[in-house]
Amino acid sequence: MTILRLLRKISKRFAISFQALWVILVGFWVGIAQQAEATRILIPMDQGQKDHLKSYGVAYWAISKGIEAQWLLNYRGGSFAMAHQMGLESECRLRGISYEVIAENTYAGILAEIQDPAVNMELVKLEKAPRIAVYTPPTKQPWDDAVTMALTYAEIPYDKVYDPEVLDGKLPMYDWLHLHHEDFTGQFGRFYFAYRNAAWYQAEVAEAERTALSRGFTKVSQLKSAVAQRIREFVAGGGFLFAMCSATDSYDIALSAIGLDICESMYDGDPAGPSASSRLDYNQCLAFKDFTLTPNPLEYEFSDIDVTNTRGLLTENEDFFALFDFSAKWDVVPTMLCQNHQQVIKGFMGQTTAFNKDLIKPEVL
């Protein structure tokens, strides 16, 4: 039976005009052909993207499902390309992100552009969804911390870990550890002067002291020193550590002060050790060297690593910084860290905002 005779028979049986049935059939096969050709989903990360954070979440979801994925560094803000699957396309729609379904020959053209030696772009295969841990007190809610809030919004799964989990050897369970608002020196963020009578500050101090005692330490600074050393072991074992704000400088300060008492009496009940600041061991540090501790224990500053108060006073409308344009083909990791839909970024103020370049170890990027 020919196709035409079959169509006429179907049209009579179901009271559908032959012309309408023909249009439906042609449309069906055209759709099949387009589906066969459209083999990639491109998630642009430039200004045209409706939701950048959720786009990262979709990329994570795709990798966790075993979907082939590539990160196109410096191509339209660091776009993602993935093997086309209906489930992936549905996920893109559900999360409200911008995406494009492109043909294989179109993607081949994109790859040719990226591979051009004269173009500062590179392709990175994404093969494993990292297991993420965020170092944060268990009492903190996702909206209390910018990191957990961003991950929660992006729908990227993570676990909270804190001092007990670190000391219990749980870090090797993860690929990535994130540190944010933290003080590894045992000085409780140096919030004493402004917040010593605040209920939240007193509760955090009491909880830290209970944890220290339960772990056999007489001081919180000793507890934090042990935690810092466990984190260093995690990094030495191949773990990725991403630190922000006060976690950056306070971490290296804690490593440099192993076995020393750099805390004054309002933080640990007794004065700092004699000449403790002059006995710091910078060889223990990951990133910084030759820094000087801030002598006033009531000052909201740990050391001269941070240049928040010395980089020059800027108004909010004047505070911007530009992302460095690394070589994508040679410096892949720093290029990944600088992927963004904007090159000029609005400034911000933190306890640790920017670093004194003279105090960064020469082997550090």
Locations of regions flagged by a protein language model:
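Bacterial N-terminal signal peptides
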Residues: 17-31
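Generic start-of-chain signal for non-secretory N-termini
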Residues: 4-8, 34-39
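Helical hinge/lid and interdomain linker segments adjacent to catalytic or ligand-binding clefts
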Residues: 40-41, 46-50, 80-90, 140-248, ...
